[in-house]
Amino acid sequence: MGTAQVLPGILQKHCCILPDRNTESQCTLCGEPEEEEGGDLAQPGLSFPGPAEEDIDQQYSWSPTQHFNEERYSPAPRNMKGLTGSRNQPQLCAGHTCGLSPPDDCEHPHDHMHHGSDVRQPYLLSPAESCPMDHHRCSPRSSVHSECMMMPVMLGDHVSSSTFPRMHYSSHYDTRDDCAMSHTSTKVNRIPANLLDQFEKQLPLHRDGFHTLQYQRASAATEQRNESPGRIRHLVHSVQKLFTKSHSLEGSSKSNINGTKSDSRVDDHHQSHLSKHSKRSKSKERKPESKHKSGMSSWWSSDDNLDSDSTYRTPSVAHRHHMDHIPHCYPEALQSPFGDLSLKTSKSNNDVKCSACEGLALTPDTRYMKRSSWSTLTVSQAKEAYRKSSLNLDKPLVHPEIKPSLRPCHYLQVPQDDWGAYPTGGKEEEIPCRRMRSGSYIKAMGDEESGESDSSPKTSPTVAIRPEPLLKPIIQRPLGDHQTQSYLQAATEVPVGHSLNPSINYNSPKFRSRNQSYMRAVSTLSQASCVSQMSEAEVNGQFESVCESVFSEVESQAMDALDLPGCFRTRSHSYLRAIQAGYSQDDECIPVMTSSNMTSTIRSTAAVSYTNYKKTPPPVPPRTTSKPLISVTAQSSTESTQDAYQDSRAQRMSPWPQDSRGGLYNSMDSLDSNKAMNLALETAAAQRHAADTQSSSTRSIDKAVLASKAEELLKSRCSSIGVQDSEFPDHQPYPRSDVETATDSDTESRGLREYHSVGVQVEDEKRHGRFKRSNSVTAAVQADLELEGFPGHVSMEDKGLQFGSSFQRHSEPSTPTQYGALRTVRTQGLFSYREDYRTQVDTSTLPPPDPWLEPSLDTVETGRMSPCRRDGSWFLKLLHTETKRMEGWCKEMEREAEENDLLEDILGKIRSAVGSAQLLMSQKFQQFYWLCQQNMDPSAMPRPTSQDLAGYWDMLQLSVEDVSMKFDELHQLKLNDWKIIESPERKEERKIPPPIPKKPPKGKFPITREKSLDLPDRQRQEARRRLMAAKRAASFRQNSATERADSIEIYIPEAQTRL
């Protein structure tokens, strides 16, 4: 049967039949006659513009009744093997049970059912037996078709059973339109028994619990939601929270599902999507075509490939596609009239024309509306929006009852594309969503989206190119695009261009993805307020239009300019989400980000708006994400860096505005570095591409988009174009990208390293050096950069160090060599200026050089207690303070010796103390000084660790203590007017030691004499003993292993000799 014929017929038949069928399908599923309800619904549904039943019947040359044994089908309402049978049974049974004439009402459903029940083993979802092959043949469209064909079966099933019967009429029409095309195109798709079982398992639940729900899409979601409106809302909110995750998940789940159901399709789709970027374009074309095919799978319009991806993705996706496409067909039609109207109304009332009519006429729009709608309507607000739009548009179409029922549906099903699709797609996906929702979202985004969406070969290359999350967002974004008329127009226009230009297409969807994420965030927020949701939808649409146009241009340019492989995956949605979550989370960066956002119209809208939105719902972990996503967005690398150093930069925020990073590090510099970034992106893309050609191409395109966006944003003010590599953690040639660099001072940023900004400078080595230093140097560099006010270049370098090459990435050529040179200079400069800094800090952080022992001890303790890292710079500060103290003591004692006529004994003591101090300073202090320098120099091969420094410092403390004791003694003598005998402490000490001995009288005099004579010497000896003991202990510890080895070496030869 011609698609043209079958689709209208199917649409008509479904539109007319499904309402009736829906009326009774619920009966079959729930045992409750839905006839009245269905009838009511059907009546409004019938009121929806749609092909006449006669046409449907006529066009359904393959009347479901022909293929479907009504009794057979109805007897197997729960026959899970023929999911169609099971689901369709309820539907058909419902139809029949409802008393709907099987030929008219249930024929098509029966046909579906018939395929489902008769062909349960093959589980043909579509009326035509040949559809399975077609479904597979048309993997991209097939996916749509299969979805649609699934939709007819499942559509009928869901429509009659789970889906809200009331909603099915209009949906039926739209769905019919979609389904007709879907049926015709998709013909019959064989759904694996397991998939059918899943469908049955899900759908019956949906039927049971959610039979009133109008959306097939919600059927799976409904299945989840059917339990209670509260749970549904919870799921909806979870889905909203997870929508980004869901995108990532969906990419992965779809990939898995694709592997399951349509692994062949996956291949086909990979090929189709890879070879069919034209088909991706056709996805765009399908947006028009799909106005029928994708119309039925409106939700899938831009993602017909997604549909195919989703379809090939699998049982779960097949479920989702069945369910989705059923929702797509019916619910889509439903949602086109209902969801779309609602959604379109919610997102853009302009788009909301008559979704029922648009569902037929504007199937792509319906798609868009639906996606955008679901985006808008994803939550209870979706209900709200649905109520609004549905009430506005669907009032004639839907009875208030239906609308309330739909409200209970929550339109979780509305986002069935993504969310509904996930729930519908299978709980498998929901679980991943939950997993992503669980908090590994960043990783899920990075790994799942990049790994699963991008990396998983199951996802079609198109999916890879347009990551499933992207695809989903794209799918939804076209819908989201249609969410807002402007974006719909932009999507219609830009997607057409994109369809013409796959790169642009991907870029646009990427943009769409980001916008979709944004829209989702908006829709989430919108869920917070349907009104704001609608305004946001409009804003989103406009924003997306602008962004789409800008980014499509920029991305296409970036694609060309960057010469990036295939698709740089813009995880723009997740990336923006993360980044903007980062900004929003890091309000410090937000000003900069805001400026970047402001500067970047696109990003400013996305980032600013998204930041605003995302501030509330950012699924991305707060700073962690912001740091890693850091450079990529409008954030300047400084921002990323700032994210990394947000705390310190919070203080330095004003001193370190993005542009104030120094003339060196202007966003314009980063623009120049954009060239470097382009090179880096190209290199990274090439590397990633080499690492994962497909994923890397996808990422490349996405990143090309990001790169172009970043360039634009950089121009706007994004200094750092770090294209977030987080998507491709495994593909990241430099596992620790600039983001890490930016964050290397932050340990948590290390965790964030998944998010790699493809910075101008991609430097693992540098990062390592930076990171190593940044830990110790970060504080110093931060303080130094701020406090020392070293040349912006040096500061830049340090910050580059600290912040990773983020600064340098843009301010400096991305060449690692340069960075290394800078780092080297930095290291030297750091140390030197650190010395200066130490001098400054010495007074602040360390006790003023007090010539006496207690201050010295305090200083030591201060060093230990100091919150500062005990790294080379810290120890240098301590050393500097100690040196100054000793020098002070020496000068004081020398002055005293000159000014006062002192006894030779006292002068000897002074000379001894001063000589000891000078010797200590000239030798051990100098050694320690160089050790600290080496510690601060990441390039130092025998680079001592902080522990080494601490150990050496402890050793020095023995000597310092010894010297300090000498000066303390001199100080006591000075207090005693340089009279040794007169020192009361000595007398007391003389007396005090005697009690210690058990024989005080005997020991008294000798001890007294000894102390009076040898007190200074004894103190020195004691100090020496302690020092020697400490040295011995240290040397023993250090050499214990060696000593053991020596002993072994010694004894082994002996043993050998003996042997």
Swiss-Prot record:
Modification Phosphoserine occurs at: 302, 308, 390, 456, 667, 670, 673, 720, 745, 776, 811, 983, 1012
Task: Classify the main location.
Answer: membrane
Q: Where is this region: Disordered?
A: 31-54, 245-311, 613-669, 723-756, 985-1025
Ranges of biased composition (kind: Polar residues)? 245-261, 632-645
Q: Where in the cell is it found?
A: Cell membrane; Postsynaptic density; Synapse
Q: Which GO terms describe its cellular component?
A: glutamatergic synapse; plasma membrane; postsynaptic density, intracellular component
The chain residues annotated with the modification Phosphothreonine are: 743
Q: Where is the composition biased (Basic and acidic residues)?
A: 262-271, 747-756, 1007-1025
Which tissues show it? Expressed in various brain areas.
Quaternary context: Interacts with DLG4/PSD-95.
As for family, the record states: Belongs to the SAPAP family.
Described function = May play a role in the molecular organization of synapses and neuronal cell signaling. Could be an adapter protein linking ion channel to the subsynaptic cytoskeleton. May induce enrichment of PSD-95/SAP90 at the plasma membrane.
**Name the UniProt record assigns to this protein:** Disks large-associated protein 2
Q: What's the source species' lineage?
A: Eukaryota, Metazoa, Chordata, Craniata, Vertebrata
Q: Which gene encodes it?
A: Dlgap2
